[in-house]
């Protein structure tokens, strides 16, 4: 088959196939996504997200775009920070994840605008948001460079991008982490979500994602300044921050 190639986990696929394959994964895991996050990370994902929210330094009335917002953890935190006079958009390219997130927020009494949106072609005007966030979503995007440029475009001058993502763990822990990721994680997926294959992909996608320094350079290439990152849990995840000047 012709066309440009990209990776889907450890597999090589045509670029125009990847989005559909990623969609299948998240349609499958959406209903069990929150409980699997708690089990897989032993609850640490809540600590990582809390740190991300505290890093933002939002003020009342700010506008926030939560890309690949999934079940709404960050959107909820952003909404509390910007208040009723602010604006928080929950977006995701996957309709199943977006529905779970919207319904979960509604059950908590939060009515936020939602959009089924592709991060590589955001349906928002230039220079609009004070903050753009993407948590555990960038690694699933086919053209990460295009997505980062779109995030830059919709930010106001002085606005901030926060990227929370799995990254490169400290080397002494690689062996144990690989055993957990490739042996235990698919088993947990099968037992809890009845879906070992999707969680095998998630483990592989983490390994294929750019490391801390590579992602930092990608953000600089997209136009961001003052780019830096903070490792958490020995580098299992990293929070990258960049500013649009």
UniProtKB/Swiss-Prot annotation:
Residues that coordinate or bind S-adenosyl-L-methionine: 71, 92, 118-119
A Pfam family of this chain: Ubie_methyltran
Presence of the UniProt keyword S-adenosyl-L-methionine in the record: yes
GO BP: any one term: aerobic respiration
Entry annotated with the keyword Transcription regulation: no
Superkingdom in the source lineage: Bacteria
Enzyme Commission code: 2.1.1.163, 2.1.1.201
Record-given protein name: Ubiquinone/menaquinone biosynthesis C-methyltransferase UbiE
């Amino acid at each position: 088959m012709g066309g440009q190639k990209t990776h889907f986990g450890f597999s090589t696929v045509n670029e125009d196939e990847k989005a559909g394959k990623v969609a299948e994964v998240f349609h499958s895991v959406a209903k069990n996504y929150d409980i699997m996050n708690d089990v897989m990370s032993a609850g640490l994902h809540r600590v990582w997200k809390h740190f991300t929210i505290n890093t933002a330094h939002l003020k009342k009335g700010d506008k926030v775009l939560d890309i690949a917002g999934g079940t709404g953890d960050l959107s909820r935190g952003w909404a509390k920070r910007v208040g009723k006079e602010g604006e928080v958009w929950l977006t995701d390219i996957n309709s199943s994840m977006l529905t779970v997130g919207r319904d979960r927020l509604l059950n908590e009494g939060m009515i936020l605008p939602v959009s089924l949106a592709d991060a590589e072609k955001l349906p928002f005007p230039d220079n609009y948001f004070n903050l753009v966030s993407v948590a555990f979503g960038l690694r699933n995007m086919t053209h990460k460079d295009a997505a980062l440029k779109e995030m830059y475009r919709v930010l106001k001058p002085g606005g901030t991008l926060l990227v929370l993502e799995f990254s490169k763990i400290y080397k002494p822990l690689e062996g144990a982490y690989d055993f957990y990721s490739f042996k235990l994680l698919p088993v947990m997926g099968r037992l809890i979500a009845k879906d070992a294959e999707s969680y095998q992909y998630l483990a592989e996608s983490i390994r294929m994602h750019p490391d801390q320094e590579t992602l930092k350079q990608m953000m600089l290439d997209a136009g961001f300044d003052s780019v830096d990152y903070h490792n958490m849990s020995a580098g299992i995840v990293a929070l990258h921050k960049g500013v649009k000047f």
